[in-house]
Amino acid sequence: MVSIRVICYLLVFSVLQVHAKVSNANFNSQAPQMKNSEGLGASNGTQIAKKHAEDVIENRKTLKHVNVKVEANEKNGLEIESKEMVKKRKNKKRLTKTESLTADYSNPGHHPPRHN
């Protein structure tokens, strides 16, 4: 009984190894075909990894371009607002809106400003 079980396990193990070798061989032969179709309907892990690698490279190029633009603006003398300056400007804008909303509109000729 034990020997039959061992033989079955060995048989299953050998079948799985043969299947892995065959599927790996088929995978390598199909890779150029998928490359020509530009990955339409592809579910290969390598193609997904390549796509992610391309995205990372593109993002790095974009970040590099943004950094170059910031450095160019600094060289041209354009002032780049710091977070504190932006915060102050937005706070000032918010306060002026609050003042206009709480203003006394009892005068019939006075119309409230439009806030778009």
UniProtKB/Swiss-Prot annotation:
GO terms for biological process: cell differentiation; cellular response to phosphate starvation; maintenance of root meristem identity; positive regulation of cell population proliferation; positive regulation of gene expression; post-transcriptional regulation of gene expression; regulation of asymmetric cell division; regulation of cell division. Keywords: Differentiation, Glycoprotein, Growth factor, Hydroxylation, Secreted, Signal, Sulfation. The modification Hydroxyproline is found at P113. The modification Sulfotyrosine is found at Y105. GO terms for molecular function: growth factor activity. Expressed in root tips, only in the quiescent center and the columella stem cells. Residues 86-95 have a biased composition (Basic residues). Residues 1-20 form the signal peptide. Disruption phenotype: No visible phenotype, due to the redundancy with other RGF genes. Hypersensitivity to low phosphate ion (Pi) with respect to circumferential cortex and epidermis cell quantities. Triple mutant rgf1-rgf2-rgf3 shows a decreased meristematic cell number resulting in a short root phenotype. Induction: Not regulated by auxin. Accumulates in both root epidermis and cortex after phosphate ion (Pi)-deprivation. This is Protein GOLVEN 11. Diffuses into the meristematic region. 'Golven' means irregular waves in Dutch. Residues 21-103 form a propeptide. Belongs to the RGF family. The tyrosine sulfation is critical for the function of the peptide. The keyword Membrane does not apply. Residues 82-116 are annotated as: Disordered. Glycans are attached at N44. GO terms for cellular component: extracellular space. The keyword rRNA processing does not apply.
